Structure formats: structure tokens, C-alpha cells
A protein has these predicted regions:
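Membrane-spanning alpha-helical segments of multipass transporters and channels
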Residues: 81-82, 90-215
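Transmembrane helix-boundary elements of multi-pass transport/secretion proteins
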Residues: 1-76, 83-86, 93-94, 179, ...
Length: 215
């Protein structure tokens, strides 16, 4: 009913594009973030990387990932302009809230990638973690099957996926046209994802310094 009332043409691409495009972008961010850090460990260049950053893991991560952030955010701006400006998909609260949500998704996804490679500091395991988490996001975020109809455990687990919160912001902002204040729990959730690297950053630094990659 929500889809029909906010998509009177019953255009299926409105559903597909607004869910698959940000989901694929999120999956790419997971994979590229893990790969860019994991290759430093695999190629035994991690110590040199840290040395160039004055042995600061924070400077090292910022220097490596900020260019990615800019590129991914530009990609996000382009797909928002294309969907809402060119194709005229429903966007009842304007395009700016969706661009802000996209920036939050990009940052949250990058931080999740740091957590993935920090938890499993090998390239193959980190990429496996990233691909698995990213693919599951499509199923558990409420795109194809409503979360409220899932098992209560799965309903709770759905909150562990950034894409779920982006989807809820999309429903509130683009489809329903609510004020951004109504989506504050989802923005806060994405902010929490951005804070998660602080839990693994010291473990990641130890892996960069001491871990020996075994093919």
C-alpha cells in the first residue's frame, strides 16, 4: 500500500533502483575498503604505510580512505540527481535529505569495512566477511520482504546493517515526505556505525605491524 500510494504509476523501477543502486554502492565500499587495507598486509607494505603516517593509524586510514569517500559521495550525488532529477522518481522532501543520507551511508559503509578488516586482518577473510555482510543486507534490510514479518531475532539483527537504516530514511524522506527529525533514530544508527572503528583500530594497527601474511 505504501509503495502504491507513493508510486501511483506502479513503476517497478522506482522500487528496484532506489534499493539496488545504494545497495550495490554499499557493497562496493565494503569490498574496496577491505581490499585497500588488506593489500597493505598482503604485500608487506603496511609498516611503510604507517611510517609515512608518522605511525598514526588514524592519519594512515584518513589518508587512504578520504579520497575514496569523495569518489563514492560523488557517485552517490550522481545517482540521486539521476533518479530524482532526471527520472523524476518520488522525492517528496527534496533531494538534499537523500544526499545527506547517501553521505551517511558512504561513511558508515567505509567504517564497517574498517571493522571487517580489523576483525579478520587477512585479505581473503576480510573480503569474505565484506561480501557476505553486503549480500545479506539486500535480504534483511526490508527491500524484498518486510522486516516486521520476519522472526523477532531477524528483526533485531536487521539493525546491524547500514542499508536497513538508509532504506528507512528513504521511506521517510523520499516516499512519505516527513521532516528529517522523524528519521533521527536511523541517522543516529548510521552515526554509531561511523564510531565502530574505534573498537578495532588498535587491533588493526597491531596486525599492520606484526601480522605475517601466509598465502
Amino acid at each position: 500500500m505504501l509503495f502504491r500510494s507513493n508510486n501511483p504509476w506502479l513503476n517497478y523501477s522506482v522500487y528496484l533502483c532506489n534499493t539496488l543502486v545504494p545497495g550495490v554502492l554499499m557493497l562496493m565500499i565494503f569490498m574496496i575498503t577491505v581490499y585497500s587495507i588488506g593489500t597493505e598486509i598482503k604485500d608487506r607494505t603496511a609498516r611503510e604505510w604507517l611510517r609515512m603516517s608518522n605511525n598514526s593509524i588514524y592519519i594512515a586510514l584518513a589518508g587512504k580512505l578520504l579520497p575514496h569517500t569523495v569518489i563514492f559521495f560523488i557517485m552517490g550525488i550522481f545517482y540521486n540527481i539521476y533518479l530524482y532529477g532526471f527520472l523524476h522518481f518520488p522525492c517528496n522532501s527534496g533531494i538534499l535529505p537523500m544526499i545527506l543520507a547517501t553521505l551517511c551511508l558512504v561513511l558508515a559503509s567505509q567504517c564497517c569495512g574498517i571493522v571487517m578488516i580489523g576483525t579478520l586482518p587477512t585479505l581473503r577473510l576480510g573480503l569474505s566477511f565484506a561480501s557476505l555482510w553486503g549480500v545479506i543486507s539486500f535480504s534483511i534490510s526490508g527491500f524484498s520482504f518486510p522486516v516486521m514479518a520476519m522472526h523477532p531475532v531477524l528483526q533485531a539483527l536487521s539493525n546491524l546493517f547500514p542499508l536497513r537504516h538508509y532504506f528507512l530514511i528513504y521511506v521517510d524522506q523520499a516516499l512519505n515526505g516527513y521532516s528529517m527529525i522523524y528519521s533521527w533514530p536511523n541517522y543516529m544508527a548510521l552515526l554509531i556505525f561511523m564510531m565502530l572503528p574505534f573498537l578495532v583500530v588498535h587491533r588493526l594497527k597491531e596486525a599492520l605491524v606484526y601480522y605475517k601474511y601466509i598465502p
